Amino acid sequence: MKNEIINYIKEVGPVTMEQLADQFGAGSAKSFTDLVKLVSSMEGQRKLVFDQDGRIALPAPKVTRNRVTLQGIFHAHKSGFGFVTIVEEEDDLFVSRDNVNFAIEGDRVEIAIKKVADRLKGTAAEAEVIDILEHSLKTAVGLIVFDEDRPEYSGYIKSKNQKIAQKIYIKKSPLVLTGTEILKVDIEAYPNKKRDYFVATIRDVVGHKDDVGIDVLEVLESMDIVSEFPDEVLAEADRAPESPSEKDFEGRLDLRDEIIFTIDGADAKDLDDAIHIKQLKNGNLELGVHIADVSYYVTEGSALDQEAIKRGTSVYVTDRVVPMLPERLSNGICSLNPNVDRLTQSAIMEIDRKGKVVKHWIGQTVIKTTFRMTYSDVNDMIAGNQEKLATYKAIVPSVELMVKLHETLEAMRYKRGALNFDTSEAKIIVNKDGLPVDIQLRQRGIAERMIESFMLAANECVAEHFAKLDLPFIYRIHEEPKSEKLQKFIDYATSFGLTVYGTASSISQDALQDLMERVKDEPYADVLNMMLLRSMQQARYSEQNHGHYGLGAEFYTHFTSPIRRYPDLLVHRMVREYGHNPAEKAEHFEQVIPELAKSSSSLERRAIDAEREVEAMKKAEFMQEFVGQEFDGVVSSVVKFGLFVELPNTVEGLIHVTNLNEYYQFHERTLTLQGEKSGRVFRVGQPIRIKLTRADKMTGEIDFAHVPSELDLVEKNLKAKRKTMSHSNRDRDDRSGRGRGKNRKKEAVGRDSGRHKSGKDSKSKSGATDKKKKPFHKEVAKKDKKKRR
């Protein structure tokens, strides 16, 4: 909401508190008080000021030596230049390599404007870093390298982060280093005019370069994602009981006689959610979503709680999970294993035929699950597998009701404008040595979508319950997309000849739904879906309820995964505490929620970054075996420096413009590259044949080369033939005749080279090369086989 306030004042000028309250709907005493506190907080951060008339205004830009200066966050590019994001500005400011002045990725900097943007000429603003207010890089991880030229240091490490070019030299250490150690170091000094490198001290030896899984561990440690728990945290977890006692059941609704079951992946160990479902006499359905009561064992302020706050979320990478809580809890007392008593928090909803929750109850329960189901079990039952239907005969009626309710809820969400971002997701299979052996597409059957649907219903129900009680609460919000990003998506969609109903500022979710429905069977549907997703804002946690745009929901929170997300744990705590003494606890939660929401959002982004970096690294490592092979893909993105192409197994690589056969001009509005001579156009969603030329595990980068199609080769041969005929005509007109044979010989070699390259070589690449190395993906292999036939 801070950005919305800033943008509003930027647009209309200084305002009174009453004007601000009207603009943001702060009509109740509670919401007005919240707004006053927020404005006060922003004043303390120098984001707002009060002018001489007592109105709320933006602070005047600081002027240093007759220059306007601003503060922002520096984002580096591996080529040396960068951009600065200013909270109060829409566009980032470009900083050339000469004006970076030793700022590094993530630094909070002060900048001076060197050149003002000129929208008529299409030129962007440029800035110069004049001061580094706060360094972001505090630690680094890397392999020790000895340097005889600097004997005053133990050596240096080079960060894997491509945006940090400088070496990190390490102060002399009593440790005996062999050159195989992966070190974690604390930065003590930063590059400056006198010294073009960092200086650091050793904090820890993470491992050795040939250790199994050290590559993944290096990524995690570089982001301060630590697997090991402190001793006091483990000791506290060990004090949790093996099973709850009768005393623990006091004040809880006893649901042990209900048919309740879990549905998870086959390899899941932390079974933290379960459901029950039944038909009521009035025709409505009762859905119970039961979540492990983690907050009963993780009390506020405890060592477990403090560690969970620091971690924010569990992190899932290819070969491991870095949990938010010790396994003693997640796989033990907080896992809803079958036929044992477990403490839970439940949302029990009565849902009518239209998918509306007409009654609900939220509170503490005790349950005993009857079955531990897997997604494949349930999908088989839905598909009519007789063996599974016989094995789980007792819950067949429940599964039938689940399918019915899921369809109702899905239709309800679609009707209210929920957007379906159904993108392909990779599952990287690694062996015991941590090496990738396969990349598969994650499958999402009806069972997976049903459980997701029921969890969404519970999250909405809990959020609406506390919003209407007007109590301090933490929400999961997804704000409306910014109009300029949505405009880029609309421009892009229309470049396919699609009609988009509405403008960037007025387009409805219904119109976006309609658009995606119209293209769902087109070859570019997945890419258009991804482009729409990229136009959205990031979902985050907030003490203010702004609804969830993507879900079309007025109220939303996270209630269903307290084992792996701290906001869910906090919600469970509020459910309990507000049930006992809401007035007393409201003030406390009002104070702690804003900071917890902010830190949880930040830690979630860190986890996503780690997961993406490990995935890119493992994909590149997997593809190294297939360098030189050709495959079919789809253009997934077009930028001024080239094309990104995605293969059927979700691997993405770059065809750089310098590897195309002519000069290509980039058209930003349509996101296309057009050949200057041929007029050929590359666009997103276009099928393309590529050759894998490079796969770099260290950087996670993959490079492709474009393989011309048969049509390209025909055109090329026709042009060569026309050129030859033109030369022949000139030769006949040449009276002297000298050089005629030489020219013809050169032309003949050129034609033979062209045929050889497009004929024999192409056949060898698509045939012999593929036979020499096994195809990396069954779908691609089938396509290649069909083409050879």
Residue ranges and their predicted role:
Residues 1-288, 295-341, 372, 379-380, ...:
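Charge-lined substrate channels and their catalytic hotspots, especially those that engage the 3′ end
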Residues 362, 375-647, 661, 665, ...:
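Append "with occasional cross-activation on large, charged helical scaffolds in nucleic-acid assemblies
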Residues 714-789:
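Intrinsically disordered, Lys/Arg-rich low-complexity segments
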Residues 105, 178-179, 627, 632, ...:
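Short, flexible surface segments
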Residues 314-414:
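Conserved catalytic alpha/beta cores of large enzymes that bind or transform nucleotide phosphates
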Residues 107, 127, 656-702, 707, ...:
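Intrinsically disordered, low-complexity linker and terminal regions at domain boundaries
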Residues 114, 188, 636, 693-695:
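Short, surface-exposed secondary-structure boundary micro-motifs
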